[in-house]
Amino acid sequence: MSLPPAFADWFARQGWTPHPHQLALLEATGDSLLIAPTGGGKTLAGFLPSLVELAGGWRGLHTLYVSPLKALTADIGRNLARPVADLNLPIRVEDRTGDTKASARQRQRTDPPQILLTTPESLALMLSYLEAPKIFGSLRRVVLDELHALAESKRGDQLMLGLARLRSLSPGLIATGLSATVEDPQALAGFMGGAQVVHADPGPDPDIAMLPTSRPPPWAGAGGRYAVSDVLKAVAEARTTIIFINTRAQAELFFQALWAENDQNLPIGLHHGSLAREARARVEAAMAAGELRAVVATGSLDLGIDWGDVDLVIQVGAPKNVKRLVQRIGRANHRYNAPSRARMVPANRFEVIECIAALEAVRERDLDGDARGPGPLDVLCQHILLTACAGPFDADALYAEVRSAGPYRDLSRADFDDCLNFAATGGYALRAYDRWQRLMQRGNLWGLRDPRAARDLRMNVGTIVEAEMTKVRWKRGGGLLGEVEESFAASLVPGDSFLTGGKIVRYEALRELVVEVSPSPRKEPKIAVFTGVRMPMSAELSHRVLSLIGDPSRWEVLPRPTRDWLSLQAQVSAVPRPGTLLAETFPHMGRWHIAVYGFAGHNAMQTLGLLLTRAMEESGLGPLGFSSTDYALLIWSLDPVRDLAPLLDRDKLRAGLGDWLAGNAVMKRTFKNVAIISGLIQRNMPGGRRSGKQATFSTDILYDTLRRHDPDHLLLRITAAEAGRGLVDFGRIEEMLDRSPVLDHRQLDRVSPLAAPLMLEMGRVRIEGQGRMRLAEQEAEALMQAAGLQFTDDPAGFDTPAEPPHRSRRAR
């Protein structure tokens, strides 16, 4: 299908030629999933069929656009204004997010625009009103942007349930998913409920390499601050740079370090999710206006607004996930068929290997990604309650509708009925309490027992459960700086200094749940500000790192100092390799140590440490502590472990996991999240919001009550399943044992070269002053000498070869 003449003329006036994938979506008569790189014109491709159809006029809502970011909906609205005005199209484009004024939201329920831009949460809210059939009855198209990102969380499951509801209200609507490159496009199409996959030209390979540094990476640590001067040099040579860092705490620290050495006074911004919304908006506006040379950011900028002036991305710290790295690389050079330029800065010696493995994966276009499980039942519970808010429903019809959603296509009737029973009564142990008696059956229809409950349910819509945060502002009514976690705020005493918003501040008081601060004269923050969960390395990248370390014939791609390190390890002990689980035991400074090189990701290695130390305690071996990384686990104890095999027995580990989890804080934390999403407890109440402490107190009591009186309760089953996949990640431990069936236990007389960096992680704190840094350097030097690692480091040796050895691309 060719463009209508008016649209063809408009493209010509812009100097554009329609891409084949844009025309393919224009021709599509059913659901489509477009896979295209950043800068490939995905958004215009998604809207082009709508604009063509709307040129002839339309009464009511025609196209619904759903994005994971409120900022992106606003940006899309500005971008659409141009063709709408140029082509004189008779349509209105409006957004509907949490930032939309109440008067506008009310008007949209009676007089919706032709194109409405929204988020998954706002869509769920709109579907909960009695007017939903009228609003969405005229709907013809749904555009789902950044679908690859939404599919990785419960927000995507909620969105697919909403899409199923939209199909019921407007049969025949066409859904279009827009996605960056993913590892399994057909699986993502199945997530949509079935769609035709359209592939855009992936474009040229990115220009990606390690950033040359004047100093070698440290043996341990996570900050990357050794490379600050080199990063500043790269920023000065580029037009605009995004510096990605994996955690908020490290982003604050790196930003502070950049400012300390920024002798050229380059304008540099900071952007992460805990900054005040106004502060983030200022940085975004400055980037859009070309006023910043660089911005230090976390995942808050993985998605969103396209800044055409960005010509360099720097990833500080190993990416942990190849797909995330590709997404970040794509933020540079938003021009189709122009290579993106990116540089990587490993934070430590182990991360050098991880970065090289990630570079290989990017060059081979071999992406990682966890297989999606079935649709979560806590999200379904919330969906049932919100469906009841919109009016009575038939259970059989709702079950059929839910099963039409991709994530829930295999949902059993028993699980659906359990969710319906929970939504109605709270379950067996809670059915006697009025507060959980929310639904009742009248004939064949289910509805709200008390229509007034709809208000409370709508106030708690959504699946995002973040750490409870407390606002930070300057004292005496000053401006808002950002947020910190409640648990951190509770630990502060007057005079403590910490980093927030790139500034070192002094804690003054906590007034009405707001942290008041003043400028601090200290040059070093006293304590850390964020305690968020670390991102574990993906399974696919873990396998790549292990395969690279275990095959000396491939070491030519590694920097010379890294090759020397691994060669010494092979002489002293052995190198980890696929098929074998390497473990070492050795004495050091009066203690016995165990190093297990599992390469299973941080969460799984941490769980393994908890299980092994528990078993060692029961055996009287006197474990004293452990530390874990994505690659390995280090345990120290009073007594040696002569035989590791019994401790690593799969059945014993699983039994130990069950005993440990039963009353563990991890389970209570997971239960709290499940209880909030399912609607068991409500954080937002008329007149205010429950504090995190109040919500935790309530869910802890409920968790203990259900364990005693209703151990098979639906929410306990959901909690156990989620804990196993999430923070505990026991599945990665089992996968580790499956791929490494042979235990290679090396009993050494001293610390090994690979174990030495692990020793430096013992007792590390997140933020250190200069004195502690000097002490750490002295300890590191002594430890490296003990491990035989006295060879000279040449910083230039850590640069990646200009032309890496050719490796054939894996067929997907």
Predicted segments with their positions:
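Short beta-strand-centered aromatic/proline hotspots
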Residues: 503-510
